[in-house]
Every structure is written in structure tokens, then in C-alpha cells.
């Protein structure tokens, strides 16, 4: 089996996240993409806008129509969500020889050298790095990377939050996620 971890705050999840997961699934013949909303990401301490349970539910709604996608609460209740801890938990659930990938945006990948035990992360997974408009990155020699450069989708969760706060209808937000965000008064 080939599985990709796709971690993020998903605050909220949007069409860019889904397009990246679909492209990675197709291009690298992934059996599953495991979306793991971060409970308390160390690089965004105190910055999440929607509560964890709401972010998980929005991810579930966004992923429900693709059998390759699964949403996990693996980081629920953790004090801080470090990638190496998540990778080790996922690896323990896989059979020997299963392929483990890490799907990530170029903006987040650019910070890899600041991650806890980043060289262990680099040894544990193969990175699938999705280009983001305006973001460049260098690839450390210790890291195995496949680039996904064909998807420069100019959608950001922060822009979606601003549009929702202004009462608008943001582009790139799945309809079920938009309905959930409005029904639960998120991002007002």
C-alpha cells in the first residue's frame, strides 16, 4: 500500500488542498491520502481560528466523495502536533514495505529545517511538495522530494476566512464546507 500523510490546520480546508491530494493520488498511484488536521501546530501556536472539532468535520465533509481520502483524528488531544510523532504513529499502522509519503505545500516545506527531528522525518517519508504561487524552497540533501509543479492554485485559507468574515462567498470552498462554516458561525 502507498499512503500519503497530508497534515495541516485546514482552517478551513479548500479546493487547493483537495486538488493537491487528487493530483498526488493520481501521479504517484497512492492508495490513500490521510488528512490529519493539526490539533496544536507548533509553527502556528495560537493562530487557528476554528476549533479542532469543526476543522475535522469540515475536512470530513470535503473528503467524503473520494474513496482514497480519509480524515484522521490522530493528533487529537496532543499538546503539540509534531510531524515526526505523527509519522511514527502512522508508520506503526502500516505493513513493512508499505510506502509512506508526506504531502506538503512549498511554503511549509521551506521551513523543514526548523522542524523537530527533521532529519528523522526526512528518512521516514518521501515528500510530495506542491508548488505555491510566490513560494520558493531549497531541497536539503537529506530529503527525498517529488515536486508537484502543475497545480499553482491561488487559494489560501486566510483569504477564505477574510471573505467569510466580510459576509462574502469565497472561491475555492467546497459547498458543504461553506454551509458548515456558516451554520456554525465560523470565521465571523
Curated annotation (Swiss-Prot):
Q: Which catalysed reactions does the entry list for this protein?
A: nicotinate beta-D-ribonucleotide + ATP + H(+) = deamido-NAD(+) + diphosphate
Keywords of the record, alphabetical order, are: ATP-binding, NAD, Nucleotide-binding, Nucleotidyltransferase, Pyridine nucleotide biosynthesis, Transferase
Q: Which Pfam families match?
A: CTP_transf_like
| Superkingdom of the source species | Bacteria
Q: Which InterPro entries match?
A: Cyt_trans-like, NadD/NMNAT, Rossmann-like_a/b/a_fold
EC category: transferase
Q: What is its EC number?
A: 2.7.7.18
Q: Which residues form a coiled coil?
A: none
Q: In which pathway does it act?
A: Cofactor biosynthesis; NAD(+) biosynthesis; deamido-NAD(+) from nicotinate D-ribonucleotide: step 1/1
Which terms in the Gene Ontology molecular function aspect does this entry carry? ATP binding; nicotinate-nucleotide adenylyltransferase activity
- Gene Ontology BP annotations: NAD biosynthetic process
The protein's matches in Gene3D superfamilies, at most eight in alphabetical order, are given as: HUPs
Q: Which PANTHER family match?
A: NICOTINATE-NUCLEOTIDE ADENYLYLTRANSFERASE-RELATED, PHOSPHOPANTETHEINE ADENYLYLTRANSFERASE
Q: Which family does it belong to?
A: Belongs to the NadD family.
Name the job this protein performs.
Catalyzes the reversible adenylation of nicotinate mononucleotide (NaMN) to nicotinic acid adenine dinucleotide (NaAD).
Task: Give the protein name, as stated in the record.
Answer: Probable nicotinate-nucleotide adenylyltransferase
Amino acid at each position: 500500500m502507498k499512503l500519503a500523510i497530508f497534515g495541516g490546520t485546514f482552517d478551513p480546508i479548500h479546493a487547493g488542498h483537495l486538488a493537491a491530494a487528487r493530483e498526488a493520488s493520481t501521479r504517484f498511484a497512492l492508495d490513500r491520502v490521510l488528512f490529519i488536521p493539526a490539533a496544536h501546530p507548533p509553527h502556528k501556536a495560537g493562530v487557528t481560528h476554528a476549533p479542532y472539532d469543526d476543522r475535522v468535520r469540515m475536512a470530513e465533509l470535503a473528503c467524503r466523495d473520494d474513496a482514497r481520502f480519509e480524515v484522521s483524528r490522530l493528533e487529537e488531544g496532543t499538546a503539540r502536533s509534531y510531524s515526526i510523532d505523527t509519522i511514527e504513529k502512522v508508520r506503526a499502522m502500516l505493513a513493512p514495505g508499505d510506502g509512506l509519503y508526506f504531502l506538503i505545500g512549498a511554503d511549509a516545506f521551506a521551513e523543514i529545517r526548523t522542524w523537530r527531528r527533521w532529519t528523522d522525518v526526512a528518512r521516514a517519508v518521501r515528500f510530495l511538495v506542491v508548488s505555491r504561487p510566490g513560494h520558493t524552497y531549497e531541497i536539503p540533501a537529506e530529503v527525498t522530494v517529488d515536486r508537484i509543479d502543475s497545480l499553482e492554485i491561488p487559494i489560501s485559507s486566510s483569504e477564505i476566512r477574510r471573505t467569510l468574515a466580510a459576509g462574502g462567498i469565497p472561491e475555492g470552498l467546497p459547498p458543504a464546507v461553506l454551509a458548515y462554516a456558516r451554520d456554525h458561525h465560523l470565521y465571523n
